[in-house]
């Protein structure tokens, strides 16, 4: 099952999705998957209110048909990861607010279907990123936090990415604490974690001082529920 591939920049010659898919008749399913590359170039970032996230999954269709209807269950994997920023486990700090978050170095495209094999445990899913060879870093995306005091959630979505010292997704958090505006950059490379599809990453601002903020990164895999799996220190 390949879902939500309309308006993803895949069929660049402006064909309708149906016509584009018919072009793969006689080709292998892998040829279709290799061509299913979405673009991530909107200056506002990925807005799920206007653009659905591509998803993929497999299922077995039963041979028995009930009154002309075939019913089957299918687990779908989202092609993007989600990033949230919390303030003190969503409890906030007195005098602290988030002003804006600038995301740098995210990639400009990604595969709708991963070429990696998902883990057999459904709660683990994919453990490796799968990235188009022509993917490259795109321009910064700025998110207005509208003076949020406890969290900025469910608004930052990113393609898969390998994070290292030379190219890593970075969030620059602009904030105000007791009337003084400051900013701090937090990077995925500091945690040695890649960005993997269908995962949720939570940066929790665990403490604030007059000069800086300290963060910890939560790594979440279970259906995007915000359940703590591991909490390495952010230093």
What are these regions (language model features)?
Residues 74, 101, 173-175, 203, ...:
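Preference for bulky hydrophobic residues occupying beta-strand positions
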Residues 69-71, 168, 200:
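A generic structural signal for beta-strand entry/edge sites
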Residues 38, 43, 51, 131, ...:
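Short linear sequence elements within intrinsically disordered, low-complexity coil regions
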Residues 1-20, 63, 82-86, 90-197, ...:
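Tryptophan-paired
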Residues 1-92:
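Short, low-hydrophobicity acidic/polar segments
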Residues 200, 204-235:
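Intrinsically disordered, low-complexity repeat and linker tracts
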């Amino acid at each position: 099952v390949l879902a939500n591939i309309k308006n993803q920049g895949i069929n660049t010659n402006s064909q309708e999705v149906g016509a584009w898919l018919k072009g793969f008749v006689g080709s292998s399913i892998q040829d279709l998957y290799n061509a299913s590359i979405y673009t991530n170039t909107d200056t506002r970032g990925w807005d799920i209110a206007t653009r659905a996230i591509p998803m993929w999954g497999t299922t077995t269709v039963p041979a028995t048909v009930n009154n002309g209807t075939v019913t089957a269950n299918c687990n779908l994997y989202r092609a993007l990861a989600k990033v949230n920023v919390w303030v003190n486990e969503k409890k906030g700090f007195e005098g602290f607010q988030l002003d804006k978050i600038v995301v740098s170095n995210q990639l400009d495209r990604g595969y709708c279907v991963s070429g990696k094999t998902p883990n057999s445990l459904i709660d683990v899913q994919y453990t490796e990123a799968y990235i188009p060879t022509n993917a490259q870093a795109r321009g910064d995306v700025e998110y207005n936090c509208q003076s949020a005091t406890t969290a900025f959630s469910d608004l930052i979505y990113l393609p898969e990415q390998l994070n290292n010292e030379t190219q890593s997704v970075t969030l620059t958090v602009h904030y105000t604490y007791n009337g003084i505006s400051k900013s701090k950059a937090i990077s995925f490379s500091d945690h040695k974690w890649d960005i993997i599809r269908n995962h949720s990453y939570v940066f929790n601002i665990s403490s604030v001082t007059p000069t800086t903020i300290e963060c910890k990164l939560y790594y979440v895999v279970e259906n995007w529920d915000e359940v703590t799996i591991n909490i390495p220190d952010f230093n």
